[in-house]
Amino acid sequence: MLSGIGGQAARAAALWLTPEPAQHGTPTPTHPHSHAPPLPRTPTPSHPHSRAPPLPRAPTPTHPHSHAPPLPRTPEIHPTQTGKRYKSKPLFPNRQQKSPEFFIRANTKDPLVCGARVFHFSPPRHGLAGVVGAARDHPAPDPPLPTNTGGVPYCFPSSRVDAPCSPDHGCRDRRLRKSRAPTRVPWSNSMFPTGVIQRLFHSDAGAVGYSGGITWLPAVSGSRVRRLQPGTAARSRVAMFPVWSTRTTLRVARLPGTLPRPPRPRSSAGAEGGFLLSPSQGTDGPARGGGSGGGRGPGGGRGGPRGSRGRGGRGRGGRGGGRRGRQGGPGPTLAAPPRP
């Protein structure tokens, strides 16, 4: 009986110690009793006992033991040194600068004005960059600047210019023309950069429309321009000024050498028109009583004395006549001034 119990125990122990075959028939290397070859282990460079070569480390210039070349350091700019590059320079370096020939405001968005008769540049207000002041309060420079426009040459680049504006060098804009050659600005057609003009202007070259973008535009000139609206023509080519907005009233003083503006008549009699610095001779327009008389040239018409209410023709010369008056004939045509 004992031998039978011992045989059963031996058989049970043999069955318990015999390893069971794998479920899928493939040896599992991770099993502790598996006879499969171990999996290849990849060397871990980060392990302290690993024999793998270390990973390539990128040189860090900021590391104290690095052999990499140092990074280029940007020069530190002191707060008091900003804007020194764009300070004003005399137009004529060989003589003392006394006349207001060159005016600049550094580190501002105001356009630069270079000319012989510019003495005041108001701060921007409502988008207006500046207004040319009255030049009669200051004497003409010596030597005078050449002109062939009937007025005074002006140049309107941006506020960052690497050279003074002069008839010999022109104007070089540092912001818009960094890699180009120095740009010579034609004095017969002064120019200024802008990026906000989206109106139609009448310039010296005619009516040209611009739709924005940083481009060089012909300067809008005139002393009687009140509001720059689409189709507005300059009444007199006696001054040049930059325009950055079309919603501000412009008032430009009259320069020496031009006729004064005729006084506004308060009676029914018409007033004779004034000169217009125009390249072409114009004819007198019809001057019906009460309206504005004048042609489209240097001459101005005369309004009628009395009669029924009428409206005169449009003219650049002068405004004559009262509200009531008879139809009057055209006034005398004034001779055009000699062109320079």
Curated annotation (Swiss-Prot):
Segments of skewed composition (Gly residues): 287-307
Chain residue ranges for the region called 2 X 17 AA repeats: 27-75
Compositional bias segments (type: Pro residues): 35-73
Region (Disordered): 13-96, 254-340
Basic residues composition-biased segments: 308-326
Sequence repeats: 27-43, 59-75
Keywords: Repeat
Name of the featured protein: Latency-related protein 1
Organism per entry: Human herpesvirus 1 (strain F)
